[in-house]
Every structure is written in structure tokens, then in C-alpha cells.
Amino acid sequence: MTEKQLDLFAGPMPVPATHSLDKQVLDAAALSDAELIAAIPEAGIGECHTLAREAARRRLAAAVLALKALCLRHTGFGGQRVVPQQAAALDALAAIGCREASRAIGDLIRRGAVEGPGLTLAVAAAAQLGSPLPEAIITNLLRHDDPQIRAAAARCAKPWPRTAPILIELLDDLHREVGMAAACALGQMGRAEARMPLLRALRDGPSEEIIDAAAGIGDEELIVLMGRTTTIRPDLTRTALEALETLDHPLAAKVATRIRAAEDCDSTRRRIPNP
């Protein structure tokens, strides 16, 4: 992605025309699905968030094309600041979260419909939904100046030939979030380069993403730490168990059995009334 040079002598950026709805229609909850969908593509600044949030609240998959159209209407206007209509549409697509929404976000990125701060929102949504993006675009995004975009792009990465070397470089990124996202992506690919960062992360700040990535490598030290995580973070017990069960390793089976036994003891203890 190439950054546009800022013209210090340029006038204010043009703003696309919008067609505000009559104020009495702004009760979005009162609109039918069809009325809501019809209103979204032409929504102005005043009503875009209200309409998009309502579509998200309803998990309205039928609104995906309308939300995408709202984003496309504002192509070219977000180089220096977030376009409210695009932000509203992207947030709604991420909340709706269906396959069509995932594809729509990927298509918006491929077509260059979002840029600047809006691209940050779009790539984060793509990572959240697993939007399909080609290797060439992910490779460019991994080199982006914005660390938030680099981190989100790492979460979108697949084991392509040109991607892994860039992710290995990003392990030493100055921004911790980027390095951790790169380590998780490499771990999912089974790359040994991610082993040490994932060991540190399991000790210092485990999460679902880190556990899943560690399972991609699954050596004995990582397996032991995945098991210990359940005593430090009981809320991650289910994630750790599921990850261990994917590993064809006798130690993983042993650790999983130990975790289940501890769960059974805790459950029994809770059922016994205090004297």
C-alpha cells in the first residue's frame, strides 16, 4: 500500500454528498428490515451510526450488501481521517459476522475502498472474521507503517511462500503487539521460529490466541506450559483442553487427563455442603 503525500497547500478535502433521512425515520428500531436496508446506502453522518447499529443488533445478514454499498460510496475520502459512514458500516459488518460480511470486508480491502484510518478498522475486522485476502495484499499490509495494520494483517496471514519470511522479521518489531501477532501466526503454521516468543507469552500473559498458536508447534515444553496455564487462568481451561486434544502426543494426553481430573475434584468439592 502506498501512502499519499500530504499537499500542504491543498484546500479542504471534498465530502461526498449525503441524503439525510427525515428525522421521524431516525427511530431505526421502528423500521422493518426492508426499510432499514433501503435506508443504509444513502445514510448521512447524522443517521449512519444509528442505522448501522440497528442492522448489527438484528444480526441482519440481508443488510451486508447495503453496508458494503455505504462504504463504497465514500471511496477516496478517508486518506487523512475516518469517514463516519465507513466506520459505521465496518463496525456493523464485524458485528453481523456472517460469511457474507466476512467476504464483503475482504472485497472492500481488495478494491481499495478504505484507506488511512479506515483501513486500520477494515483490516482489524478482516482479522476478526477471517476475511479471505490474497497473499499480495497481506504481504503489503505486513509492511504497512501503521503497527495496528501490521498486527491485524499477521492475524490474516496464511502459510504462503512470501508471508512467513516477513512474519519472522516482525518477531523483532518495535511494537509488542505486532511481534506477538506474528508469533501467533507462525505458531499456527507450525514454524519453530515462534517457539521462544510463545513460551514467554504462555508464562507472562496467556490468551486463547496464544494457546492455539502454541498447539501448532506442540513440543513438550509448550505442552507443559499450556497445562500450567489452567491453574493461573482457570477461564482458559476449556481452550487449553481443546488445544491439547488436537495434539498426537502422549504428554498432551497426560496433561489433558490431569486437567480433567482437577476439574472433577473442583466440581465434587463445590457439591459437598459446608458443615
Label each residue range with its predicted role.
Residues 253-275:
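Terminal, low-structured helical/coil segments at or just beyond the last alpha-helical repeat
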Residues 2-10:
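Short linear clamp-binding motif
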Residues 9-28, 38, 42-61, 69, ...:
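Structural detector for internal amphipathic alpha-helices that build alpha-solenoid repeat scaffolds
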Residues 1-2, 275:
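Initiator methionine at the very start of the polypeptide chain
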Residues 102:
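Functionally critical, cavity-lining and gating residues within the transmembrane helices
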